[in-house]
C-alpha cells in the first residue's frame, strides 16, 4: 500500500506549491480579500519561481486567486451566499463520482479511503480542525481516483476546495462529528460497491452542507 504521505513525499514542486497554497487559502492563512505578492509567496514556499507561478495560475483559474498586474495577487473574498452557489454546482458531479467510485473502486483507492476515514475519525476525537480538513481533502482525492472519470474529477476539484474553505470559515467550530458521520457513510457504500447507496449518501452529504450554507447566508 502506498500511503498519501508517501505520494506527497515524491510529488513534483509545482504540485507541492499548489497543495500548500490551496491549504493556506482554505484555512484562511491567506485571508479572504487580502493582497499578497508573488515574491512573498515564492519566499514563503521556498520552491522556486516557476512552480509557485504555475500554482498561482491554476488557483487563479479555479477562482481562488485574482492576479492583478502592478497590484499584486488578491485572495478571493468569502461571501456567505456564494457557498450555496458552489454547492448547487457541486451536487450533481458528486453523485456521478460516488456512483462511479462504487462501480470501479480499486484496492489502491480502497486503501486511501480507509486512510482518510481513519484520519477523519482521529481528527474528530482530538477536535483537530486542520487535520479534519486534510482528511477531507484526502477523501476527495481517493474519490477522484476510485471514480476513474478524470472529466468529473477535474470539474469537482475546485468546487470541493471552495466548499471546504466556506466550511472552515462558517462551520468548523461545531461541525466535525456530524460531517465525519456523513463522509464515513459515503465511504462505506463505495467500498461495498453499492452504487445506489453511494449516490444517496453523496446527496445526504450535499444536503448537510447546504443546510450549513443556508444558515451562514442568513447570519
Protein language model regions, located:
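Hydrophobic alpha-helical segments typical of transmembrane helices
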Residues: 21, 51, 82, 139, ...
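Short linear motifs at protein or domain termini
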Residues: 1-103, 210-219
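Residue-level recognition of alpha-helical structural elements
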Residues: 82, 105-109, 128-132, 148, ...
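Hydrophobic, amphipathic alpha-helical faces that serve as interaction scaffolds
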Residues: 89-105, 137-173, 212
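C-terminal all-alpha effector/ligand-binding and dimerization domain
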Residues: 9-13, 114-121, 126, 168-219
